[in-house]
Amino acid sequence: MKDKRAELLGKYPVKKLLVKLAIPATAGMMVNALYNLVDTFYVARGAGEVAIGALTFAFPVQMIIMAVGLMIGIGSASVFSRAYGRNDREKMNNVVNTAIRIDAFLSLILAVIGFLFLDQLLTFFGASTSNIEYAKDYLSVILIGLVPLSLSMVLNNLARAEGRVNIAMYAMMLGAGTNILIDPLFIFDEVTFCGTTIPLLGLGVRGAGIATVLSQIISFSYILTKTFSKDSQIRVNFKNWLDIHFETVKDIIVIGMPTFLRNSLGAFLAILILKLISFYAVGDSDIYQSVYGVINKMIVLINYLKQFQT
């Protein structure tokens, strides 16, 4: 299996290899974008249109943590790929260990900051008196899943760098599919099926957050077990968490920084638009912010569809 992947990456025609690697990655991200729309639909039906604002305010926070995960993931994948081409196993393991450690550290720091300053962040984002409680309910849960979310992005990129693109796709699809299935269980009070009323948990927007975090943990568990299976060349030393190679950190960040800037600028743009809505909206701004959140998720899905076509 390892020799087959090495031959694929080293000798396969570039154009065919690009299609073979790109389609699973784009398909997985497209399903991920679609589930975000479904998540919004469930929240609107179960908690009302004002509650969609909770997902809207969570978007910049998730974008920033995704920017960190992509920075570490893409940077480490590039360094790993070069070591993979040289068959430098020591460097490969060094990159993986360093990437996981710094990503876990950075995402944990961001999650702690989010918990400590949640009220201040939401006020700064422009949350109104109508939707700030919804946003607090949702984000207080979502912050728990930031570390596995960010680590999943790192492991997804490393799996692709090793030529195991299907594993990354399955991980994203597993997380999205799980979220779509369990969202109603946590959000709705009850559901009627074949004339029978079935009681559910009825946690509203907090339930949407719980379902999202659980799906992220399931996706992370899958990619974790597959990434470090016997068929993989990726190995992690879990004993010494302070064993970080700063030269490797520099290489990873230099390569991944443009990706971080691009995604974090998207988060800051979302914050700016939310603040403008709260300032200029006629009457309560909560509905306008919810509409912006829905449009934003549709734009993300359309962008992935465009990537799939190209």
Residue spans for each PLM region:
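Short alpha-helical transmembrane segments in multi-pass integral membrane proteins
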Residues: 1-22, 80-147, 194-257
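Residue-level recognition of pore/gate-forming positions within transmembrane alpha-helices
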Residues: 25, 33, 60-63, 98, ...
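Helix-terminus/linker motif at the lipid-water interface of multi-pass membrane proteins
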Residues: 34-53, 122-129, 187-195, 199-203, ...
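Small-residue-rich hydrophobic transmembrane alpha-helices
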Residues: 52-112, 149-168, 274, 289-310
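Alpha-helical transmembrane segments of multi-pass membrane transporters/permeases
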Residues: 103, 159-185, 206, 210-213, ...
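Hydrophobic transmembrane alpha-helices of multi-pass small-molecule transporters
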Residues: 179-183, 220-224, 301-304
